[in-house]
Amino acid sequence: MANKESKNVVIIGAGVLSTTFGSMIKELEPDWNIKLYERLDRPGIESSNERNNAGTGHAALCELNYTVQQPDGSIDIEKAKEINEQFEISKQFWGHLVKSGNISNPRDFINPLPHISFVRGKNNVKFLKNRYEAMRNFPMFDNIEYTEDIEEMRKWMPLMMTGRTGNEIMAASKIDEGTDVNYGELTRKMAKSIEKHPNADVQYNHEVINFNRRKDGTWEVKVKNRNSGDVETVLADYVFIGAGGGAIPLLQKTGIPESKHLGGFPISGQFLICTNPDVINEHDVKVYGKEPPGTPPMTVPHLDTRYIEGERTLLFGPFANIGPKFLRNGSNLDLFKSVKPYNITTLLASAVKNLPLIKYSIDQVLMTKEGCMNHLRTFYPEARDEDWQLYTAGKRVQVIKDTKEHGKGFIQFGTEVVNSKDHSVIALLGESPGASTSVSVALEVLEKNFAEYEKDWTPKLQKMIPSYGKSLIDDVKLMRATRKQTSKDLELNYYESK
């Protein structure tokens, strides 16, 4: 039986994951007290900001790293199914927020945009063809199209076909249900909704600086006002650390055992941004390529139409950039301060295991704009230097941890949920596809750490997310029904199954 006493929840960070969690808690338990602290002057400035991430609605429609080629040449699409389901769950929750009046004008943050996969070379073409065959036979992806015809590709992505002839070996697949998501705008809308809640207190320019665990299991959270310098202490039954790159240092300050043998390595992304409106207007899709052999998923190149502040723009990247800061607005001492006696062997083991990744990162850092432009020309052969500017986007901190399966110093890709044994501290670490799957991550947090409330919360969660507790992978009828409804709620295009 759940304890019906009001609880105090402290949320650290005002990014997409924190505001998603806060939006859920205020509906599940309206009487609970929520205190949300953000060290900067407004929400969604760091990784969630629309200029600091790729803005892709990651649904595994075009991202080739979610479909893995097996030794026999067949393609495993299980990860793609999982990612697609998670994004559909996110869309359901966003649709609920719109219908309930918590947020408005969904086109401010989500727009329909076809997703295309593009490859060159005989082996890559064979891979894409096999992927197409595997995906088109599964209901989630049965609207996928495939071509090796340059004239068809000219219709799909005319900008990328300029200057090409039919002699080049290349192929593309396309799914029209793709989206571009402005996670910064979505975050701002959710933060504004939380601010209006009578039992929520949202404070900007406030930085959590330390924690003290009390004998009764609750937490004293020390918070510094960055404007005045004043420090206050607030009590919390639950501490939710959703501070992006700042999560690992904060988790370490709690002193919980789960924070040991854990570290992070900061990587930022750079993008080329197009400044020529004529070029921008020739491309109205997201096109993902294939990552170079032996490189991590974050290296997948893509040429993306983006909608930022109501205007179309065009980005290409990412190019990795390394540095010691854990946040764009962080300190050059962040990495060094995160090295502790209890995690130094973890970090050193990771360095030894991942020398190719380190070399790749260094090569990327040394790459000039000319080198970046040469990469762009593999997508858009006639790209001109004067039409593009190099921009440094957000930071991501790759989680490094010890595991039974992989030993010491394993680099964890994706989003990692870490919680204390008593579930009073919850931290979200890692990176992509975090924003796209933020709702599924929040649900995982609820299920793992608030199990005593499951009976009371399940009907409420099913109202927010109609497929909650069911499988969109296994239930085709439910998948199509929820997809049709969310398309209506979010003002997206809906395509009947072929």
Curated annotation (Swiss-Prot):
The keyword Acetylation does not apply. It comes from Staphylococcus epidermidis (strain ATCC 12228 / FDA PCI 1200). Keywords: FAD, Flavoprotein, Oxidoreductase, Tricarboxylic acid cycle. The keyword 4Fe-4S does not apply. It is an enzyme of class 1 (oxidoreductase). InterPro entries: FAD/NAD-bd_sf, MQO. It catalyses: (S)-malate + a quinone = a quinol + oxaloacetate. It holds the Pfam family Mqo. The lineage of its organism: Bacteria, Bacillati, Bacillota, Bacilli, Bacillales. Belongs to the MQO family. GO terms for molecular function: 2-hydroxyglutarate dehydrogenase activity; L-malate dehydrogenase (quinone) activity. Pathway: Carbohydrate metabolism; tricarboxylic acid cycle; oxaloacetate from (S)-malate (quinone route): step 1/1. Its EC number is 1.1.5.4. Its cofactor is FAD. GO terms for biological process: tricarboxylic acid cycle. This is Probable malate:quinone oxidoreductase 2. Transmembrane segments: none annotated. NCBIfam families: Lac_Quin_Ox_NO, mal_quin_oxido, PRK05257.2-1, PRK05257.3-2, PRK13339.1.
